[in-house]
């Protein structure tokens, strides 16, 4: 009996067996990502794909300053409003910046025909040559070129007029018919502007042009219009009851434009040979100009980012990330951080048997922890880690490259009569924006799910690699660990890690130790059975003795009577 109890104590006493465990890296990162199946998964490493910051300034685009219109708008700049005279010297720009409520446009009241189309054309122009299409001093010898000024276009307290147009009036009591032509020899498109004056009454008409009925004709290969002045009383605007309507056309290289009139012509003085640039555009912004450079400009401010998406503004100029409505687009590159992997993912095997990551393993994503008589330590599996890093890096770069289509996205121009078209365009743009946002978010969710499952699969494969080497020379004890049936020094541990473990070398020792452990288990079973029988018999005897004592006491004091009948 003593021998059996000794065996039991030996079996119950703890022994420090050599062990090796498979695990994964963990750190103090608080980065969270979303996947198809989960929200806010804490991971060791991740990359942000969404730019949400800007500097709040207008900057040079690729080293080229923008054309900042200040208090002028496109009409005031291109017609030559006297208050916009400082802009006349500008010849090139990266983009055009206009304030939302610019004061100086058409100073003499009237309509600007196809103004939105002109803005659209100028949005793709990065430079122009301003030149005299009809030199002022020699083009109009039979007409007055000096008295055509107005208080509506005053400058520095004096009446003035547009710097790119001439208001032709009668000279010496007559307004002879005029016929002027220009041939475009610039090898570029030429923007030509002119106007037609509509007096408020017949007296003004006769005073200025010496005739009641007048016309203006403008003809080119692609343009053919005849204008008749509309003489009528109108409410005064900027002190003027008359009106001027403004017109423009683009003259192709080699084409000719002909002006014919017998009154009311606001003649071209300067025209513009246009040079287009793909990166140009017009933005409406209250941001101030600053000494800074950028590759991407928005109305809110400049973006300096190589990320594929941004949520700052849908209108951009330059090499800009794609606008989406998302608030978070973060792609995982590392592993799940502690706590452990628990649920099965969408695409691969799950290393759900490992309860937590190792903060002590800092030189890799997956690896080993061993313990033997020589000590303990962590070691990363460099091959599987490097393969994972290469695969994930290539995937992230591929996603960014595919989605990072840098481009300019400027607003389309619509006039007041095209409100329904503008609303329809907004709905279409919103639809595309929703699709882009959905695609971007779904892409990130799917890739995050795949990456996390990829890591889980790698840990599982590493575990199976060790298990297949050790076979029955060790036993699985849970949490990704194996307990050896033999002594495994550091050299032995290293062979397990690098895949050169010599199974036959340790199989005999393992077999003997395994049989001893199995024998101890059998002896322990016998001891447990003996103890159980002994305990049962002893308990029964104690119970019988107790009952007998109680019965004797009760009989002696008369509480219990016993009768024996024969």
Swiss-Prot record:
Pfam families: Hemagglutinin (PF00509). Residues 551-566 are cytoplasmic. It is a single-pass type I membrane protein. GO terms for biological process: clathrin-dependent endocytosis of virus by host cell; fusion of virus membrane with host endosome membrane; fusion of virus membrane with host plasma membrane; viral budding from plasma membrane; virion attachment to host cell. One of its GO terms (cellular component) is membrane. A lipid is attached at residues 555, 562, 565 (S-palmitoyl cysteine). The keyword Cell membrane does not apply. Residues 18-529 are extracellular. Keywords: Clathrin- and caveolin-independent endocytosis of virus by host, Clathrin-mediated endocytosis of virus by host, Disulfide bond, Fusion of virus membrane with host endosomal membrane, Fusion of virus membrane with host membrane, Glycoprotein, Hemagglutinin, Host cell membrane, Host membrane, Host-virus interaction, Lipoprotein, Membrane, Palmitate, Signal, Transmembrane, Transmembrane helix, Viral attachment to host cell, Viral envelope protein, Viral penetration into host cytoplasm, Virion, Virus endocytosis by host, Virus entry into host cell. The chain crosses the membrane at residues 530-550. Homotrimer of disulfide-linked HA1-HA2. Interacts with human CACNA1C. Belongs to the influenza viruses hemagglutinin family. This is Hemagglutinin. It comes from Influenza A virus (strain A/Hickox/1940 H1N1).
């Amino acid at each position: 009996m003593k021998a059996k109890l000794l065996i039991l104590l030996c079996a119950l006493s703890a022994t420090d067996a050599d062990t090796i465990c498979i695990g994964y890296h963990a750190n103090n990162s608080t980065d969270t990502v979303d996947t198809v199946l989960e929200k806010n998964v804490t991971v060791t490493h991740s990359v942000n794909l969404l730019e949400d910051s800007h500097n709040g300034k207008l900057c040079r685009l690729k080293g080229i300053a923008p054309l900042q219109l200040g208090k002028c708008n496109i009409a005031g700049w291109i017609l030559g409003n006297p208050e916009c005279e400082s802009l006349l010297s500008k010849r090139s720009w990266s983009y055009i910046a206009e304030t939302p409520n610019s004061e100086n446009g058409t100073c003499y009241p009237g309509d600007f025909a196809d103004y939105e189309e002109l803005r659209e054309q100028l949005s793709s122009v990065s430079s122009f040559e301003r030149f005299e299409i009809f030199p002022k001093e020699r083009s109009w010898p039979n007409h007055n070129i000096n008295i055509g000024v107005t208080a509506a276009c005053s400058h520095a307290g004096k009446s003035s007029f547009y710097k790119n147009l001439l208001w032709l009036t009668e000279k010496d009591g007559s307004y002879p018919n005029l016929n002027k032509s220009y041939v475009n020899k610039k090898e570029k498109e030429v923007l030509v502007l002119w106007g037609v004056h509509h007096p408020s009454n017949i007296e003004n008409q006769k005073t200025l042009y010496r005739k009641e009925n007048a016309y203006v004709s403008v003809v080119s290969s692609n343009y053919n219009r005849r204008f008749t002045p509309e003489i009528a009383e109108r409410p005064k605007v900027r002190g003027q009851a008359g009106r001027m309507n403004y017109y423009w056309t683009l003259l192709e290289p080699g084409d000719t434009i002909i002006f014919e009139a017998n009154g009311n012509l606001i003649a071209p003085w300067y025209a513009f040979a246009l040079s287009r640039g793909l990166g140009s555009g017009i933005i409406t912004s209250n941001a101030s100009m600053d000494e800074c450079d950028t590759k991407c400009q928005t109305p809110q401010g400049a973006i300096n980012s190589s990320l594929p998406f941004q949520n700052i503004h849908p209108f951009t100029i330059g090499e800009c990330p794609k606008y989406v409505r998302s608030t978070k687009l973060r792609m995982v590159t590392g592993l799940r951080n502690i706590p452990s992997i628990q649920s099965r993912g969408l695409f691969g095997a799950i290393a759900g048997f490992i309860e937590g990551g190792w903060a002590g393993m800092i030189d890799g994503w997956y690896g080993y922890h061993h313990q033997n008589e020589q000590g303990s330590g962590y070691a990363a599996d460099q091959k599987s880690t490097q393969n994972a890093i290469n695969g994930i890096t290539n995937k992230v770069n591929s996603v960014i490259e595919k989605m990072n289509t840098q481009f300019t996205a400027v607003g389309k121009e619509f006039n007041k009569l095209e409100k329904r078209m503008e609303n329809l365009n907004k709905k279409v743009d919103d639809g595309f924006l929703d699709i882009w946002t959905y695609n971007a978010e779904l892409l990130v969710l799917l890739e995050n799910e795949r990456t996390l499952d990829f890591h889980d699969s790698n840990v599982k494969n590493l575990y199976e690699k060790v298990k297949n080497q050790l076979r029955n020379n060790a036993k699985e004890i849970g949490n990704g660990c194996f307990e050896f049936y033999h002594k495994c020094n550091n050299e032995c541990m290293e062979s397990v890690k690098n895949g050169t473990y010599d199974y036959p070398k340790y199989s005999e020792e393992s077999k003997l130790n395994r049989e001893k452990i199995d024998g101890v288990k059998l002896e322990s079973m016998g001891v447990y059975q003996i103890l159980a029988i002994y305990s049962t018999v002893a308990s029964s005897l104690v119970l019988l003795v107790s009952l007998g004592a109680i019965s004797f006491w009760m009989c002696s004091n008369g509480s219990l009577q016993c009768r024996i009948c024969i």
